[in-house]
């Protein structure tokens, strides 16, 4: 997809393919209204008011294809800042595809993935952070993730970054003035103090923003959560309890979970990617052995480990091994089967375990409370009006910007001339511009929009 601004008219189906009540075929571009008017029988779309919905039929060679409602939106007050037409059809693969092909035959071009959002970016309707927020909103798995995405779409991150970049420019301009007009004896000291003060101010701001990354990334991507334990302690039953559906195979036979099962579940606004692992033990079964190896890998990569023990049986060597290999993880120990007489030796276990009964659904809510304690210090997940970093690209760029600011600090400590330190300060300004797209390379922008679905 070329990054250069284009003016041809594009079209795509904007709703998921399949059976449904409504389907939407979208056009955007200079000729969007004229092309739609060619295939629409009803009011003349080229003369109707902007932001109106018009009843009629889509026809080809006087044959009715569908009864539709057509939305006409004139530039610049549209998502793409171009003329936009949305044809609301009856849902279904055949009718939406037929209308799409008719529009292409009438002069439109098939849109590439993300091209509508790309045009909104190129035409200045949104910046790159807002474009990425569109995708985050589509992919949001919980209401909290949706709130963060909507805030970014509304411009919270854009405004913070743009304001910081402007302050950096103001600082650089003041330094230039002081360098160009060195009439005063103390101008060098004043300039050095200014740069030191502003650099520390920018560092504090970006460090505070970076501090939100852990929470933001969890809300966006979820916590990779490995459920581990020896065979038949209730791992799959716990998974099904959290999911509230029979996803894993639950039997009384050891080793029935032979692979890694992954599912998402919403825990108080946090998407947990639950990984039910095969029981970690020595086995001669080839298929089960593969599952065990995958389980060990899942344990290494997990953000959170739920270690399930059987409270109705004494600790085994396998239990002790699992306690040992998971001790450096963010771990919650669960004593399952508390509905049965206790036989486990709790004196060998850490104090912060949670007794549960998956069978009777007892104390499952305490798992959710412990997760909140582990990852969010019992604080609310999303603070009102707060700006969160949740995108790995943004996090990486903020870290690079902080490195450039630290280079300025180090230069000041070494007594380097301020005019030489302008290079690192300018680099900070450029890096922050990559976040919003003001200084992002074409290849990055092209790659970003290619991840979008067709019609968005």
Swiss-Prot record:
Cofactor note: Binds 1 potassium ion per subunit.
Residues that coordinate or bind Mg(2+): 236, 257
GO molecular function per UniProt: GTP binding; GTPase activity; metal ion binding
Subunit text: Homodimer. Heterotetramer of two MnmE and two MnmG subunits.
Protein name as annotated: tRNA modification GTPase MnmE
Species: Streptococcus thermophilus (strain ATCC BAA-491 / LMD-9)
Record-listed E.C. numbers: 3.6.-.-
Role description: Exhibits a very high intrinsic GTPase hydrolysis rate. Involved in the addition of a carboxymethylaminomethyl (cmnm) group at the wobble position (U34) of certain tRNAs, forming tRNA-cmnm(5)s(2)U34.
Key words of the record: Cytoplasm, GTP-binding, Hydrolase, Magnesium, Metal-binding, Nucleotide-binding, Potassium, tRNA processing
Binding, GTP: 232-237, 251-257, 276-279
HAMAP family xref list: GTPase_MnmE (MF_00379)
Main location: cytoplasm
Keyword Glycosyltransferase tagged: no
């Amino acid at each position: 997809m070329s990054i250069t601004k284009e003016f041809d008219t594009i079209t795509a189906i904007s709703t998921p393919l399949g059976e449904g009540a409504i389907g939407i075929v979208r056009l955007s571009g200079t000729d969007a209204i004229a092309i739609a008017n060619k295939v629409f029988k009803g009011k003349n779309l080229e003369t109707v008011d902007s932001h109106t919905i018009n009843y009629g039929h889509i026809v080809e060679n006087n044959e009715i294809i569908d009864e539709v409602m057509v939305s006409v939106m004139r530039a610049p007050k549209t998502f793409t800042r171009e003329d936009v037409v949305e044809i609301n059809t009856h849902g279904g693969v055949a009718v939406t595809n037929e209308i799409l092909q008719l529009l292409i035959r009438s002069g439109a071009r098939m849109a590439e993935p993300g091209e509508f959002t790309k045009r909104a970016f190129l035409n200045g309707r949104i910046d790159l952070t807002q474009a990425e927020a569109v995708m985050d909103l589509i992919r949001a798995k919980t209401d909290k993730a949706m709130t963060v995405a909507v805030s970014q779409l509304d411009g919270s991150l854009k405004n913070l970054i743009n304001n910081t970049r402007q302050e950096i420019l103001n600082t650089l301009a003041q330094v230039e003035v002081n360098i160009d007009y060195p009439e005063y004896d103390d101008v060098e000291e004043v300039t050095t103090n200014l740069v030191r003060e502003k650099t520390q101010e920018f560092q504090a701001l970006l460090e505070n923003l970076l501090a939100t990354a852990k929470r933001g990334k969890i809300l966006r991507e979820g916590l990779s959560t490995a459920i581990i334990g020896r065979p038949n302690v209730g791992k799959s039953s716990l998974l099904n309890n959290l999911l509230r559906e029979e996803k894993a195979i639950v039997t009384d036979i050891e080793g029935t979970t032979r692979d890694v099962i992954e599912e998402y579940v919403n825990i108080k606004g946090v998407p947990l990617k639950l990984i039910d692992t095969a029981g970690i033990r020595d086995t001669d079964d080839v298929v089960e052995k593969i599952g065990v190896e995958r389980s060990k890998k899942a344990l290494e990569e997990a953000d959170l480990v739920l270690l399930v023990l059987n409270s109705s049986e004494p600790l085994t060597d396998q239990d002790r091994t699992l306690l040992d290999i998971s001790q450096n993880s963010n771990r919650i120990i669960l004593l399952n089967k508390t509905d049965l007489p206790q036989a486990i030796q709790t004196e060998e276990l850490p104090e912060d375990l949670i007794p549960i009964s998956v069978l009777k659904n007892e104390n499952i809510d305490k798992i959710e409370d412990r997760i909140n304690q582990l990852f969010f210090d019992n604080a609310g997940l999303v603070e009102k009006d707060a700006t969160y970093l949740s995108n790995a690209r943004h996090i990486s760029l903020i870290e690079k910007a902080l490195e450039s600011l630290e280079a300025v600090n180090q230069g000041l400590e070494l007594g380097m001339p301020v005019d030489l330190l302008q290079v690192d300060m300018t680099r900070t300004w450029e890096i922050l511009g990559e976040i919003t797209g003001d200084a992002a390379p074409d290849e990055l922008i092209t790659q970003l929009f290619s991840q979008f679905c067709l019609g968005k």
